[in-house]
């Protein structure tokens, strides 16, 4: 039940959410509505509240407990438009066993900020255009997410995406593998030139052969360096594996930096050489005319030097020009992973290729659709809901960016250090800090993989917890490792694949229809898929018993719901 007082206080039983505003409320389909612009009315948090925010698939924050920074600091989080820190236009505040949902009718123009003050986190919502804000109290956060899905435009389900790109079916119960040469980082991130060839070559086929011989029957291998494109065909012919090629239409190396940074990337990363032709004419510009910056490279001086960001409109044109000849040369490719492009939207003020935020979304959707029209499985980094119809999978969506380790983008084939493992255990793998917002809204529409710098096997001591999260959320695994580390990781990779694959084959095409926490400490959680299959996990160190069922520590139960 939702009721409203004057001044505006939304109540449900003893739970109250106060809105300090003079706006006159309306009601529509059970939601209270307000018209607003600029700073939007949001209740202040109270001690004991939890905020559930759309960072990648979703995070849950006890508002009175500060989070130590990892890749980003939460207390300075400000995201104005749809991006990986705002994948859904939905914000949840949990208080007294109830959940207040807040959304607007224009996600593209709604942003939020999180700040730490007076011993707790505070949430601010803003809009750069007039919007209708909707508020409603639900009994559970899961019910709020499901109601949000019901009020959104219909999304393209994975079943329809498989119908148009049949190879995608291989990822239902499958996995993505990024297998790296032991010296790849000397080429990618060193501050000196090297003659080392970064291609993984035949060693990747050896790993693939071992995986296949041990039951990994569904997989897609990511190929990063151009020299490894020749592996796409034997991966398909020998093992039935898919191959996708890494590509980048964002990071542009200023030719003047050749000689300042090592030439390794120019010589070995085909996309780097292809991007340089668009400097400076194709670079996105700010309102003041400055060139947009992008991923930094280490120079001979040991310092990092920023590249520049290609305008999304120019990027879309380059995809249409460059990818077909590559596919003609390597027809065994079945996918394309476009890094960075799916992480957000922006503007460009260069008069040769101007873009508004709305234009940018249209351009990016068209670019991804063009890959689909080439018959490719379409993937990107993170993604957000307005892109979902044109994407098949997203790497990083299952690894909330604010909980990743610092520099995880540069450490995407390393085994965690003790300090990195401790940070991941504290947040990324802590069940109280995660919540499957994206899965409750769109599980049947997108495949959400981990980030390659937070891959399934990266913490051998924690791989069981990674496996439990994947099963609970119905997400497939992603493995990223060097060939030299494969022998020590092999057993854990195979065990996790077998466990996750079995669950994902059963639930991968279903909606997540319910989700709940079964214990006060959040260690035992339950997800329901299609109102048919339940997955229950115990993240705790004590056995859990209920309804005649016993679940051991780090235990997993899944199957048909008991009637």
Where in this protein do the model-derived segments appear?
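Extended, Lys/Arg-enriched charged tracts that mediate electrostatic binding to polyanionic substrates
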Residues: 76-83, 88-90, 97-100
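Short acidic-hydrophobic catalytic motif
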Residues: 166-172, 176, 180, 203, ...
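A short acidic, amphipathic alpha-helical/loop segment
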Residues: 206-210, 230-235
């Amino acid at each position: 039940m939702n009721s409203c007082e004057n001044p505006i206080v939304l109540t449900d039983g003893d739970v109250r959410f106060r809105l300090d505003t003079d706006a006159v409320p309306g009601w529509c389909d059970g939601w209270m509505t307000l018209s607003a612009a600029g700073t939007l009315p949001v209740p202040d948090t109270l001690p004991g509240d939890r905020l559930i925010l759309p960072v990648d698939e979703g995070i849950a924050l006890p508002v009175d407990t500060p989070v130590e920074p990892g890749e980003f600091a939460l207390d300075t989080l400000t995201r104005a438009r749809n991006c990986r820190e705002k994948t859904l236009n939905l914000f949840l505040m949990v208080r007294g066993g109830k959940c207040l949902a807040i959304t607007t009718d224009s996600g593209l123009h709604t942003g939020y900020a999180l700040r730490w003050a007076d011993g707790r986190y505070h949430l601010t919502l803003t809009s750069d255009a007039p919007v209708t804000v909707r508020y409603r109290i639900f009994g559970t956060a899961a019910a709020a997410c499901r109601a949000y899905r019901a009020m959104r435009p219909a999304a393209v389900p994975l079943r329809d995406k498989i119908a148009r790109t049949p190879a995608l079916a291989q990822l239902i119960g499958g996995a993505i593998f990024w297998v790296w040469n032991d010296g790849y980082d000397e080429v990618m991130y060193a501050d000196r030139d090297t003659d080392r060839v970064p291609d993984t070559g035949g060693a990747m086929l050896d790993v693939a052969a071992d995986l296949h011989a041990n039951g990994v029957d569904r997989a897609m291998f990511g190929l990063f360096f151009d020299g490894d494109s020749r592996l796409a065909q034997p991966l398909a012919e020998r093992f039935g594996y898919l191959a996708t090629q890494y590509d980048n239409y964002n990071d542009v190396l200023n030719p003047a930096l050749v000689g300042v940074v090592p030439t390794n990337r120019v010589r070995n990363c085909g996309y780097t050489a292809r991007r340089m032709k668009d400097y400076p004419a194709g670079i996105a510009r700010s309102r003041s005319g400055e060139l947009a910056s992008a991923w930094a490279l280490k120079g001979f001086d040991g310092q990092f030097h920023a590249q520049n960001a290609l305008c999304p409109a120019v990027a879309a044109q380059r995809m249409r020009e460059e990818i077909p000849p590559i596919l003609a040369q390597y027809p065994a490719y079945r996918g394309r992973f476009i890094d960075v492009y799916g992480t957000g939207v922006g503007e460009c003020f260069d008069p040769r290729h101007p873009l508004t935020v709305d234009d940018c979304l249209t351009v990016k959707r068209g670019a991804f659709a063009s890959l689909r029209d080439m018959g490719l499985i379409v993937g990107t980094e993170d993604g957000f809901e307005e892109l979902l119809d044109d994407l098949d999978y997203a790497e990083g969506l299952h690894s909330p960016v604010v909980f990743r380790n610092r520099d995880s983008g540069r450490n995407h084939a390393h085994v965690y250090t003790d300090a990195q493992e401790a940070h991941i255990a504290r947040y990324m793998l802590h069940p109280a800090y995660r919540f499957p917002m994206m899965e409750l809204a769109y599980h049947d529409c997108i495949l959400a993989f981990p980030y390659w710098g937070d891959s399934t096997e990266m913490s051998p001591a924690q791989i069981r917890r990674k496996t439990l999260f994947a099963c609970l959320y119905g997400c497939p695994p992603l493995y990223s490792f060097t060939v030299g580390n494969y022998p020590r990781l092999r057993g854990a990779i195979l065990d996790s694949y077998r466990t996750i694959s079995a669950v994902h084959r059963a639930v991968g095409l279903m909606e997540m229809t319910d989700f709940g926490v079964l214990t006060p400490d959040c260690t035992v959680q339950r997800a329901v898929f299609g109102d048919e299959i339940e997955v229950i996990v115990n993240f705790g160190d004590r056995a859990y018993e209920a309804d005649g069922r016993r679940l051991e520590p780090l235990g997993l139960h899944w199957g048909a719901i008991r009637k």
